[in-house]
């Protein structure tokens, strides 16, 4: 009898771990479905090329899964994910000493340009507006650009603070000053 009980315990433990892993995978997949497009856009904004961005995205979600398997905090997984992707992008940029990619090329890759059905004049106006906006963005500090980009992704100040490792008040200042400067420049 004792031997039978000891044999069933590892099986129960294995089943429990398996079921927990299945739940965590579902959670990661749900978060992927909700956030991967916006997160990829954010990486593109940071100057990460498309291929590298896909790798960083994949590594970020793998790290998220491992974080959850290790029993990590689940209170704000979206901010956690952005912080990891942000840090991976910064590490890539510093190790590769990569220059920022052309935003117009990224817009083409992500489909953010006007459709072919639009008139040539509309397309030209859209491209000119986008160029003016990008030129204005380049005049902001890196912190202001990052805060505004994450805010445009729908993040709250608290989440942005977590991602960028800043205080909430600093995030608020960066957003406010960034918007004011954009209004002046555009």
Where are the regions that the model predicts?
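Arg/Lys-rich amphipathic alpha helix in sigma70-family domain 2
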Residues: 83-104, 113, 118, 126
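A short, charge-rich alpha-helical start-of-domain segment used by transcription regulators
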Residues: 15-41, 51-54, 65
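Short amphipathic alpha-helical boundary/capping segments
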Residues: 13-19, 27, 131-140
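Acidic, proline/glycine-rich intrinsically disordered inter-domain spacer in sigma factors
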Residues: 26, 108-135
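Extreme N-terminal regulatory/targeting segments of RNA polymerase sigma factors
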Residues: 1-19
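DNA-recognition helix of helix-turn-helix
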Residues: 86, 90, 158, 162-186
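Structural recognition of an alpha-helix C-terminal capping motif at a helix-to-coil junction
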Residues: 55-62, 66, 75-87
């Amino acid at each position: 009898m004792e031997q039978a009980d000891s044999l069933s315990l590892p099986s129960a433990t294995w089943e429990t771990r398996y079921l927990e892993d299945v739940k965590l995978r579902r959670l990661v997949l749900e978060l992927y479905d909700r956030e991967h497009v916006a997160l990829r856009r954010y990486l593109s904004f940071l100057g990460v090329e498309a291929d590298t961005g896909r790798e960083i995205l994949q590594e970020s979600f793998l790290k998220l899964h491992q974080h959850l398997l290790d029993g990590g905090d689940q209170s704000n997984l979206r901010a956690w994910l952005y912080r990891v992707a942000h840090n991976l992008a910064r590490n890539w940029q510093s190790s590769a000493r990569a220059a920022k990619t052309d935003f117009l090329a990224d817009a083409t890759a992500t489909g953010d340009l006007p459709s072919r059905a639009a008139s040539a004049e509309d397309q030209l106006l859209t491209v000119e507006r986008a160029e003016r906006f990008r030129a204005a963005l380049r005049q902001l500090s890196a912190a202001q650009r990052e805060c505004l980009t994450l805010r445009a992704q729908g993040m709250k100040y608290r989440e942005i603070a977590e991602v960028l490792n800043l205080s909430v008040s600093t995030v608020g200042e960066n957003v406010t000053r960034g918007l004011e400067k954009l209004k002046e420049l555009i």
